[in-house]
């Protein structure tokens, strides 16, 4: 299955919305896994803690990469959105800029906990990880608001 999110006559709107929600849920699950890893005990075995954080970050990085592909890529959500509502180009540009910022935060954290067993300051990694999760949360909220404004479709909630 490709990463295109483009609704077409062969892919009804409902399927498009379901796929969008499914992918949002995957990203949210990755965010939750990172939150749990960051909150885990670290003082006694920092190497194991760092490895759990690294594994969660690798998964988050992959899911975020898919998010960028389905929003910015050919046939992606942002192209469809701009065709439907060109007035929202400023909001699309903002979300696109956020992708680069968030990617940088993910990459920085991965460097701090790689290779496994890296002796990085736990509190600093937690602070940076928490800041990353906050950025992702706000990005998701803005994305949900944008889709609703363009299409009057609520993609925000996951069950």
PLM segments and residue spans:
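Small-residue-biased structural context
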Residues: 1-159
